[in-house]
Amino acid sequence: MGTITLSRSGSKQTSLAANAPASAPPARHWPRDWPSQKQLLERQHGRLEVMLNTLIAEARALGPLANAAVTPSWELNCRRLQRALGLHLRLEERWLAQWGCLNSGHRASHRLARTAACQVEPGKDSRRPDPTPELEWLQGLQEWFFVHRDGADAIAYRRADHACRPGT
């Protein structure tokens, strides 16, 4: 097969050969050093916080007279939050354990959060479009998240900062 050459006036020529290897997307690798791991975990914290704030604001806006047509997307976003929180907690545990900075209390706190996150199934009772129980659930998760992030996580992250320094 032949080669097709494409060009625009003033731009670089591009060649499309039939036997040209397809370029694979770059492989994503998890960071191996603590500073990069910490940065990724902090970005996840930020996204989780935004998700919680958004869902709480939407639940307040929906109120007890929620329209059944509006709630499915909100319920889907609640499920996304549950999944994102679970994945974040597992990754954080793995990395903190790798640096010797995950204690049993921190792990137990994560277990409680996972249990609390799974206690509510948004939209399970479709006859009741009132998001008030979910609002209370979201506020409870938010409270845990803020306390945990500023408490157990902050302590464990400082320990990991110290543990990964050369000569310590």
Which residue stretches match the model-derived regions?
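Small-residue-biased structural context
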Residues: G2-T168
